[in-house]
Structures are given as structure tokens and as C-alpha cells.
Amino acid sequence: MSKEKFERTKPHVNVGTIGHVDHGKTTLTAAICTVLAKVYGGKARDFASIDNAPEERERGITINTSHVEYDTPNRHYAHVDCPGHADYVKNMITGAAQMDGGILVVAATDGPMPQTREHILLGRQVGIPYIIVFMNKCDMVDDEELLELVEMEVRELLSEYDFPGDDLPVIQGSALGALNGEAQWEAKIVELAEALDTYIPEPERAVDMAFLMPIEDVFSIQGRGTVVTGRIERGILKVGDEVAIVGIKETVKTTCTGVEMFRKLLDEGRAGENVGALLRGTKREEVERGQVLAKPGSITPHTKFESEVYVLSKDEGGRHTPFFKGYRPQFYFRTTDVTGSIELPEGVEMVMPGDNVKMVVDLIAPIAMDEGLRFAIREGGRTVGAGVVAKIIA
């Protein structure tokens, strides 16, 4: 039997279900797979195979996530679902599964609950750009006014966290009803799929973004100059391009006079490739690991930012004791550690292993960063936390 060929023809979009425990996220995931397979063709997945999520390790953090895939006529979706609330928090903070859009599941029987709010806040902090609401269990509510009330509450809650609550799609359905093959609820799943297609714009591909390459190594080649190596994170580097060296020290500009891969000279390097870039007139000691090579003006160095952080539990190899204000660990960005101090939110005296917390970080040296950049928190080379830059302060 020949292997199925992966069709690269359709745009690929990453989504996931978020929301309060027991509001039906996994049931909805199963319903989407089942109904779309029935309507558009494809492979159905049953509830058990989704809920029984395998353990993954991202930066030493144990996260249970299940990944399913489905198709609409226009797109291919990769969808992530997590069994437990802690898994969601870790998943969103580490970026183990980056989302182009989230499906917020709210049970019509309960309305918004504490984790509904927390997931919306996290979505805002970690930069989930679009949210679509699926109001679940609507078959268990026979009062039309109550459904309207819940919808209004959810929209207001989203607006509170700067999502366009009044304008985003809200679909009232029943995941279980759809799984059981009831036509009126199956139609709601198709409506959800159409909302995904129209409301979430096609994500920009890494290769089309502004060039950026974290510098992993620097060496000089007799008679040719300085070469920096690394994996291109985004964009394209062409021979002759002007580039900026950003982070740690003052930003300097130079020109890339050569690109090589596996000792072969190329005209350009593209996102995802490991390359060496030859820099004109740059001395070996002017560049170091931890800086980035980038399109001039596309990224700036910063030292102070607000972040959302998950602190590893003892079982995950994290700290055994809490930390307090005045804690000074290393913050590992892309390829290097930088020492920094922290400020905890008002009223938070200490942070326990296994907690997630909002904190302001002040680094001793600037790092090239954008909002949404992930980092690890380390003590002597051991990872004790993971975080994401939520808002740049200075």
C-alpha cells in the first residue's frame, strides 16, 4: 500500500480549543473531525483517541496535548486539544502548539466560568490573534433568552480583554448532538468550520516575513572575514543584503557578502535552513552568540518587559521551593542566557513550583525581542520555568 501524499496545495492553519473544564472541548474536537469527514471527506477520529493524549516534552515541561487534523474545501487545519487545565496553561505559555486562532468553548448551561476568563486572558497575553466562540450544550437549554444572555456575557468578557467581542462569530450548538448524527447540530459544526475559514485570515508564512537569524556561532575565515552561523527563523537572506546585528551591544549594520550551507555557496538562505553568513568588515569580537542577524529596522533590543510565566513543578525537574521578589535567575532567549531581576504583581508575595504568574522582567543586557517571543528561566543551566513576552516596557 502506498503512503498517502501530504497535500501542500491548501493553506495550512493551526487552531485549538480553549475554555473551562467539562464544557465540552474534547467532544467538540471529536465532533468537528467526524462531521467534516462526513461532509468533506477525510478521516474521522473518535473521542477516546483524542482524550487519551500522549505526553510531550517541550523545554523539559510535560504537556499532554492531542493533535488532530481536518479539512474544509479551502484549508487544512491542525487542531490541538488538551485534557487538563494545567496542560492548557503550559501549552499556551511555551508555544508548544502555536495557534493562529482559538475556538473558545462555553457551555450554555453554565455560561463563562473562571477558566473561561483565564484562557481568554492567556490568549491575549500569548498572542492568540483570533477567537471564535462555540456555545456548547445548547440542546440542554430550552430558554431562548437564556442563550442570548450567555452569548452577551461571553462577548462582554472577550471585549474586556481587547478581543472584538461584538464582532466575532458565536455559534450556538451541541457537540454531543453532532457526534450522535443529529442533523440540526451537525449543521452547526459546518457553520463553525465556515467561520474558521472566513474569520481567521491565512497566516503569513515564515519565509514571507522580515529576515531574522539567531546567531549560534561566530568564527573568522582567513582572508574572507567573519562568518556567523545559525538557523534562519524567518524570511530570506540574499547575498548583498544589508543586515543589522541586534542585541547585547549597540546595533550595527553590515552587508552579507556570502551565504553557505554544508560548505556550498548559495545565492540565498531561507527560513528553516541552517546557514553560515559572511559579514563584510565585521571583526570576530564584534559579534557574539545571543545576538540576532535581522533586516535593519525590523526588530529592536529591549531589557524590560511584562511576561506570562509557568514555573516548573518539582516533578518536572523544577525548583523544590518557592521564589520571592529579588529572585535573579537567567533568562534564556533563542541561543543565550541573560541575567535579570523580576517584579511580582501587587499582592503576590511568592511563586510556588507549578504556578503560572504574570511578572515584569528587567534584563542586565538588551535582547532583540518582539511581543510573543518565548524564553526559558534557568538556574545554572537547569530549566525552572518557561515564559512569553506579553508587553515590551523598555
Swiss-Prot record:
Name of the coding gene: tufB
Name under which the protein is recorded: Elongation factor Tu-B
Organism field: Vibrio cholerae serotype O1 (strain ATCC 39315 / El Tor Inaba N16961)
GO cellular component entries: cytoplasm
Functional description taken from the UniProt entry: GTP hydrolase that promotes the GTP-dependent binding of aminoacyl-tRNA to the A-site of ribosomes during protein biosynthesis.
Catalytic activity field: GTP + H2O = GDP + phosphate + H(+)
G4: annotated span: 136-139
G2: annotated span: 60-64
Keyword terms, alphabetized: Cytoplasm, Elongation factor, GTP-binding, Hydrolase, Magnesium, Metal-binding, Nucleotide-binding, Protein biosynthesis
Pfam families noted in UniProt: GTP_EFTU (PF00009), GTP_EFTU_D2 (PF03144), GTP_EFTU_D3 (PF03143)
Family: Belongs to the TRAFAC class translation factor GTPase superfamily. Classic translation factor GTPase family. EF-Tu/EF-1A subfamily.
Residues the record lists as binding Mg(2+): T26
Molecular function terms from GO: GTP binding; GTPase activity; guanosine tetraphosphate binding; translation elongation factor activity
Region (G1): 19-26
